[in-house]
Every structure is written in C-alpha cells, then in structure tokens.
Design a protein with these regions (language model features):
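Well-ordered, non-membrane alpha-helical segments in soluble/globular domains
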Residues: 166-168, 212-215, 219-231, 254-259, ...
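Viral RNA-dependent RNA polymerase
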Residues: 6-11, 15-38, 43, 49-94, ...
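Catalytic histidine site
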Residues: 114-175, 291-304, 308-316
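Active-site substrate-binding loop(s) of clan PA
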Residues: 185-189, 196-260
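A structural micro-motif recognizing beta-strand termini
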Residues: 135-137, 155-156, 198-206, 277-285
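Extended, non-catalytic subsegments within catalytic or DNA/protein-binding/adaptor domains
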Residues: 152-154, 159-180, 189-193, 231-233, ...
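C-terminal subregion of chymotrypsin/trypsin-like serine protease catalytic domains
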Residues: 270-273, 284, 291-371
Length: 941
C-alpha cells in the first residue's frame, strides 16, 4: 500500500548486529540445525528501524509514525499491527494464529475443574490479572507477578538501571500506572539466563502461587514438540495470544573429554539437558517477558503444568520464530523470600460477582472486580443523625455543618454522589521513596522502637484474650459498639446495634482467667476486678480460626471492606466543596485476626507513649503533655507543626510493609490458643518467626490492596491504609516517622555541606507523631536546609501534600515551639506553676459543642445539650480565666433565651481538678492548691 513497512528492512548480517547479540545453534522444524543469530526482540527491531531510517533519510521517530499510520488502516487479520505486537512479513505471519483480547474491566468468575487445577483458559485468565507491562530505559515488555510480591522480568530490560531508578508498571484493566523503585539487592537472576525475579514489590497486589503452574525440572523429558502459545500484555494494555508449535532445545554437557574410552570400556558420561524453547510463532518488539504455555502434547492430551518459560528473543534471520528461556517451579521458589498465595482469595472474590459491570463511582485508580448480587450490596446512610441544638448560633456562629451524604442534598450543586470525590482519596499515585534510603531509615525506626518498647514479654494469647484483652496496661478489649462489617451486619437482630450480638457475655469474678491447667500457662494474674467478658459465638470463632489457619499456611483469606461516608460535622468550606470524608469498615473477623497477630506490640506501643517518637494514647491533661514540650525545647525552640493531605489514601505501600515487618520481628513468635467449650480441649496455632512475618506480610497486603465494596461494585485499591483497620493509628504513626527521616536523608544528601549520617536525625531533631500529625523541634545547625518549606517541597515531588497543622499551607519558614499546634491543641504554661502545661483546644471546637447534637434515642436532647455545655466549659478552663468567663457569659445568655438552666462559675474548681491531672496526682475541687504545691513540685522533679 506504499510507504515503509517492516518488510522493507534488509536482512541483517552478523556484522550488522550489536555486540551483545550472540550466535547459537538452534534446531529447525525438520530437526536439522542452523546457525542463527538471535537478540532481544526490542533491540532487534530498534536496530532494523535505525538502518531503515538511514536508508530513507528520515529520523527513527518519523519512521515509527509512518509505519503506525500505515498499519492502523490495515486489516488486523492479515496485515501488520505494531502496537499489538504482530510483526514480520504478512506471509509468514499467517503461519501462526494470533488472537488479540481486549478484555473487559473485570474477567468472569473463574471456575475450577474437578481435579482442583484450573484449565488452560481459566489459568490464563487468572494470570492476566497479574500480567503487567513494564517500562524501562530499554523499552516496554510484559512481566508476570507471582508468589506474592515478586515480578518475573527480563534481565536485558533492567541491565541499564541504577539503584533508585524509577520503573513504570502498567497494571491490567487499564488501571492508572504505578511507579516502583529499582534496587539491585532485590534482583535474583535465574542461573545464566535472561530471566530474573524482582522481589518484594509492595506496590503490587500479592499474586497467586503461579510457580505451581510452571513445569518441574523432573518432567522436562516429557516435552519435545507440541502445540503451545505465547501469552503477552501488549502496549495497548490488552492481552494477546500467539498460537503455534513449540519445540524443546536440548544441549549436551560432557563430563570430561568427549569420546574418550576409559579402561573399563565405558565412555565418558554425558548429560543431555533442556535449555530453552523455540517456536515458529512470529513475535515483535515488546513481546519479551511473555509467558510460553503448552496446550497439548503430540497425543492431544493436555499438560498438567503448562507454563514453560519466558520469551526473551526473536530471530534476526529471514525465518520467523522466537526463543524462550526455561523457567521451572524450582527456579521461582528458590529465588523468592516469601512463598505466599492469594489465588483462593481472588477466585472467591470473583465468584461473588454476577457481572463485570463497572460502577461510575469507581475511577481508574481502582481495579474493578465486578458487580455483586443486589442482596450482597452495601448501602450508605442518606440521612444525618446530627441536628441543630436549641442554642444553635446563640453562643457563636457555626463554622461547621453536617457532611453531605447524598447527591440530592440541596447543598450539593453538582448533584454528584459525594462518594465519587471521597473515593479519589485512594486513587492518587505517589512516587516511591528511594530504596537505598528506605532500608537504613527502617533499621533506624526498628532500633528506636526496640529501645523504647523493650523486649516482648508475652508470646501467647487465647482467642478470648484477643477479644477481651488481659490484665496488663494497654491490652484494651474489642470495641463492641461499632458495626460488625460486611455480611455480619445482615445477621444482626432487629433493634440491636454494634457487634455484641455475635458474642456471649457474662460477669466474671475478680481473678478470672481465660486459661486452665490443660491449656496455656497464665502469664499474668487474672482480671483485677469484675467486668463483662465476651466469648465469640461458634460461627464467628470458627471463621476467625479458619482465617488464622489460612495465614499460617501462607495464604491470604478474603476480607471484604465497605466504604461508608462519615456522618460528621465538616468545616463550611469543605461543605461548599462537597468534600465528605470516607470510612472503610472492616469485617469483625478481620479485626480480630489483626488483633491476634499484633496485640502484644500495640499494647506496648500505647503503654510507652511519650518515650520514643509516638504520642499515640496520650492524655493531654497529664504530665506527658508537658514532657513533649520539654523534650522539644531541649533540642530547639523552633521548628514546625505538620500534617498531610489525604494521608491514609497516599500512605506509601513499601513503608506499610516495612512497618508490619518491624512488628513481626519485635514479636518474634506467637502461639494462639482456642478452647472447645463443649469438650474442654485446647488447640493451638504456633507462628514461628518465619510464619509470623509471612502472616503479617499478608496482612500488609490486605491493608494496601484491600477488596472494597461500594454499593454493588467490588474493587481493589492499590495503595493507602484503610481507615477502619484496627492498626491504622499505629501504622500511620510509624510511617509518619519514616517520612520525616526519609526527607532528612534526601535533604542532607542534597546539601553536601551537611555530611551527616541518617542516624544523626535524632541528634538534631526532636519529633512527636500521632497518626498523620507531627511536631518537630529542629536544631538551628540544620534549620537552613531542613525546614518546613524544604520538607514540603521534597514531599511534593513524590505526590505527597505536607502542610501546617491548621491545613493552611506552609507560609512561614519556621514556628516557635510555643506556637505549635498538635492534636488541635497548644501548650500554655500555667500562670502560677510555670512548669505545668495546659492543653487549650481550638476555640472553634469548644463553640461547636453548643451548636450541634447527635440524635440518641436513649438520651433526652436537653440533657445531652447540657452535658455538651459542661464539657465545653471544662475545655475553656485550659485557656485562661478571662476566656472562661466570657464563654460562660455567652453560654448562660443562650441558655436563658431557651429557658434552660444556667451554669454557675466553677472556674476555680475546674482549674484545681485539672491541675491535679496535669501534675499527675488526684486533686479534688475542695483541696486547696497551696496545700498540694509540694506534691506538685515533687511530681515535676
């Protein structure tokens, strides 16, 4: 049809081929051998394009564009399609059958055969969900994720990469691309082949154990010539199948000099081994990394293990064909660190869906699985439980309002469902931190936590203790008032709230224990006082034990999380922007499983509040509040208070994974016990160091790549930490601490004059973290290059928004410590006892307690409003006497207008009681402060 086509390129001679191309002896269809030059298909076509462009007197870019324009108008059945990977002379292209699949956003449910193995069609469909398009400096090709967070790649695609170079991955189903950071320590090359395993990529959803579909080394003798296919992810994002004949390549290895006869009459031994595969299938630029699969043998019988190897090269002779390197099950499993499997969870998730229909609320940042049946759909509240109080607007103008929950809300000008905007929280893609810096920062955080927490003291738990906690500070019980989550809530009897219906409750005497002489030994005394104790009902307990057993085997159980809009008050500006926050609710069994694996760490993390970098669990009306400020002033009186935008949704996957590894290594090992309440028999699950770390890696994958439900749309996210995760605040706090140290690592590298090791961070910075909030006192020695402006600019390059605590943006270089805001509070020295630090909260927060109430059918609205006024007055004391009395006057004026009882002036009593808490002693309102001044001072010392 005119113009330039690939057939116009002259055949290459050996002299034309770049130095890295090798010459090999490969068999042809008739069994004879031919000296054939091969190279990677990407290098091959790039070289041919360069020659053709020089012949025509045009640039390579012009050549590619003209070819693309030409083939886009041709019949894809008979002509060339450069983008989809079909190349070569059309006459030879007919020799192999090419099928291009433009798959829907979600594949159909995958049934299993009676033998338990997937047939070829379903096996490739499962692989398609984990077959990526990888883009490096060398070009693009396919790459298969397998056995967890591992990627099978071609070595020639990564040879030019340096540590910390970014690599782009294009996921299936046209999901937004992701970026990963290269580091050579994560690469394991398989023998001397062109195949490598890229290990531990947290940004990838954990893949099934595809190694079980690859051929075993012991079965290679069964493969000679057979029908097969190449399975590839094309540049257009679609899956491509290339069908043809595959032939095994066998080589001979001699032990000694060939043909030498020994004295005993035997020849020197030789070994014939299979080294790869060749095929008559035509391939093209970008086909590397594709999976070679066997369809059936010469007798028409299917192979049990069909995956044979990875495509690495195309022929440069006039004959069409391709070459693949052998990859066996043993090769894969010998190269990876953690052999985990997610196939059961994926198959179960897909079997829940009755169609592949997408939902308009779910954007390209999610991987859509499909639509569930109407009976399984999730529903969001459409009516708020927050109403105006009788004193609305009488004390102070409102600065908040109930969040918008429906598209029909008159305050919603776009009439778009607020869930659409809320879901974008998890759709953002961030750039990974440099892998070379992440490792030392993780080690620094792990060391700091080990020094702060000390060694783990307990190494076992019963399931009842997981639910109720134990008689040790920090071991709080499971919260019973919240929803039990997906499916469980449909079992809840009418009129009941929370999750208590899934538990049996009883009153226990002091000294009660969940153990006995036939089970685990009791590491602590029983309960210190009578309390209500909960035991799981059989259905829930069985499900929890099955989930724990699944994790123990290295497999991921299926947990379904629900997106729910938060029924809360939002700033008026957020209302105007229809910015409603989202809550991702976990199933109760997922919460109990997470508690079982991490409760010892979480309890110690809360117990040691104010001793390391964490403020989680702090009582701001305690001496710890003053300690936080005092520790910062020991380093500097200047620094910054910070916060992150969309923190949960943009949380770095690698750092989430690192956080869970830290928890696993601190715990080291764990034994979980379950008692059969009918027979009294105990059973246990023993998590050794490897099993525990593997289980928590699977839970990290659960938190990062969560299966979520919004209405009837089941989808999976790619990064972030779900807000309903019981470990949310712990993970967020640890990752927040890592963020600032990674910023320090980058900025001190950017300023060579500051030749400081990463460990010097704690010498020049004193920080405190609570979730996404942080405060940093920064030494003047480094403030010129490690300051809030430089920090926010660095985070912006990674797609993270770092701003001041009031969300107004970083406008000043630094702040005084006395002006810091942390947890919506500040530090204010007492006017009489300067060492005591008050914790005044934002005045708007106090005022809003008088404007709104939440509907509670069990409490009279007037009594509820009065309780809120009382709480507001107690908070007003933390400011000063003048603020309190002005606020009291406004409150009483408002109450008088509404014919409600007014409040007396109780400033002195409130202050005395609060000072006792600030000093760490119990002081009643009747106790004179002067009589306790010695006690207060002694506490300070």
């Amino acid at each position: 049809k005119g113009g330039i086509g690939w057939k116009d390129f002259k055949p290459l001679t050996l002299e034309d081929v770049p130095a890295e191309v090798e010459a090999m002896t490969l068999p042809t269809k008739d069994g004879r051998t031919r000296n054939t030059t091969f190279m990677s298909s990407g290098d091959y076509l790039a070289h041919r394009a360069k020659i053709a462009a020089e012949q025509q007197g045009i640039t390579e870019e012009e050549l590619y564009q003209r070819v693309f324009d030409q083939v886009s108008q041709q019949d894809p059945e008979t002509d060339l399609d450069y983008e989809s990977g079909v190349s070569g002379d059309p006459r030879t292209a007919r020799a192999s059958k090419t099928v291009v699949h433009s798959r829907p956003a979600a594949p159909r449910p995958l049934p299993q055969t009676q033998s338990g193995d997937l047939n070829l069609k379903d096996q490739t469909a499962l692989m398609a969900r984990h077959l990526y398009r990888i883009r490096t400096r060398r070009g693009e090709c396919s790459a298969l994720a397998t056995n967890g967070h591992n990627l099978i790649v071609n070595v020639h695609m990564i040879t030019d990469l340096k540590d910390d170079d970014p690599v782009m991955l294009l996921p299936p189903n046209h999901v937004t691309p992701i970026t990963i950071s290269f580091h050579r320590r994560d690469i394991v090359i398989i023998g001397n082949s062109d195949i490598a395993i890229w290990k531990n990529i947290a940004r990838l959803p954990a893949a099934p154990r595809f190694s079980k579909y690859f051929v075993r080394a012991s079965d290679l003798s069964h493969f000679t010539t057979f029908n097969g296919m190449i399975y590839s992810r094309g540049a257009d994002g679609n899956v491509h199948e290339y069908h043809g004949t595959i032939q095994a390549i066998r080589e001979t290895k001699w032990y000694g000099t060939p043909y030498v006869i020994r004295k005993d009459g035997e020849t020197i031994k030789k070994e014939i081994f299979l080294s790869g595969w060749t095929s008559d299938i035509s391939t093209s630029h970008g086909t590397c990394g594709s999976i070679w699969l066997a369809k059936e043998n010469a007798y028409g019988k299917p192979f049990q293990r069909r995956a044979l190897g990875i495509h690495i090269a195309g022929f440069t002779s006039q004959y069409s064909g391709a070459f693949a390197a052998l990859l066996t099950e043993e090769d894969i499993e010998g190269a990876i660190d953690w052999d985990i499997d997610t196939s059961a969870a994926e198959l179960e998730a897909q079997s829940m869906c009755i169609s592949t229909r997408e939902h308009t609320l779910v954007g390209p940042g999610y991987d859509t699985i499909g639509a569930v049946a109407p009976k399984d759909a999730s529903f969001n509240p459409s009516k708020t439980n927050i109403i105006r109080s009788k004193t609305y607007g009488l004390v102070a103008p409102p600065v908040t309002a109930p969040a918008i929950l429906t598209p029909l809300d008159p305050r919603n000008p776009t009439q778009q469902h607020p869930l659409r905007k809320a879901l974008t929280k998890y759709e953002s893609r961030t750039v990974p931190f440099p892998a070379s810096a992440r490792k030392p920062v993780t080690q620094l955080i792990e060391y700091k936590l080990s020094k702060t927490l000390g060694p783990c003291q307990y190494y076992d738990l019963t399931l009842d203790e997981v639910v109720n906690g134990i008689a040790v500070p920090g071991y709080a019980g499971l919260e019973m008032e919240s929803s039990p989550g997906y499916r469980w809530k449909k079992l809840r009897p009418s009129g009941e709230e929370g999750k208590a219906f899934l538990f049996n409750d009883r009153i226990a005497d002091a000294g009660f224990t969940f153990r006995d002489e036939n089970g685990p030994q009791d590491p602590v005394p029983g309960w210190p006082e009578c309390k209500k104790l909960w035991t799981m009902k059989p259905e829930l307990e069985q499900r929890v034990w099955e989930d724990l057993s699944t994790l123990h085997r290295g497999e991921r159980p299926l947990f379904i999380w629900e997106h729910q809009l938060k029924d809360e008050r939002r700033p008026l500006k957020k209302i105007k922007d229809v910015n409603t926050r989202i809550f991702t609710m976990a199933q109760v069994n997922a919460t109990i499983v997470s508690r079982a694996l991490s409760l010892h760490f979480v309890a110690k993390f809360y117990e040691t509040v104010g001793q390391g970098f964490s403020a989680v669990g702090i009582d701001t009306s305690s001496p710890i509040w003053a300690k936080l400020r005092r520790d910062m002033l020991n380093v500097s009186d200047r620094g910054c208070d910070g916060d992150f935008g969309k923190f949960d949704g943009t949380l770095d996957p690698d750092l989430i994974m690192d956080s869970l590894r830290i928890i696993a290594r601190w715990q080291d090992h764990l034994t979980l016990w379950r008692k059969d309440h009918e027979t009294g028999q105990w059973t246990s699950l023993v998590f050794g160091p490897k099993e525990l770390e593997r289980a928590l890696i699977l839970m990290a994958n659960e938190f990062i790549h969560t299966y979520q439900l919004v209405f009837d749309c089941l989808h999976r996210k790619w990064q972030g930490n779900p807000s309903g995760n019981c470990l949310t605040v712990v993970i967020n706090t640890i990752v927040n601490a890592m963020y600032l140290r990674l910023a320090f690592a980058y900025l001190r590298w950017k300023n060579p004059i500051a030749l400081l090791p990463i460990a010097a961070y704690d010498r020049y910075v004193k920080d405190w973290f609570y979730g996404d909030d942080n405060v940093l006192a920064i030494s003047p020695d480094i403030l010129d290059w490690f300051n809030p402006l430089a920090i926010s600019e660095y985070f912006a390059t990674l797609g993270l928004e770092y701003t001041t605590a009031d969300k107004s943006g970083i406008k000043q270089q630094v702040k005084k410590v006395k002006d810091f805001r942390f947890l919506k509070r500040q530090w204010r020295p007492d006017t009489e006892f300067r060492h005591l630090m008050w914790d005044p909260i934002d005045p708007d927060t106090i005022n809003e307690l008088t404007n709104w109430i939440r509907i509670n059918p069990d409490i009279d609205p007037d009594l509820q409003l009065r309780e809120q006024f009382s709480n507001a007055l107690r908070e007003a004391v933390a400011h000063d006497r003048r603020f309190y009395r002005e606020f009291l006057r406004k409150c009483n004026d408002a109450l008088k207008q509404c014919n409600l009882d007014q409040f007396p002036d109780e400033f002195d009593g409130f202050r005395t009681s609060r000072i006792g808490r600030l000093a760490g002693v119990s002081v009643t309102a009747e106790t004179k402060l002067a009589e306790n001044s010695a006690t207060v001072i002694s506490v300070r010392i």
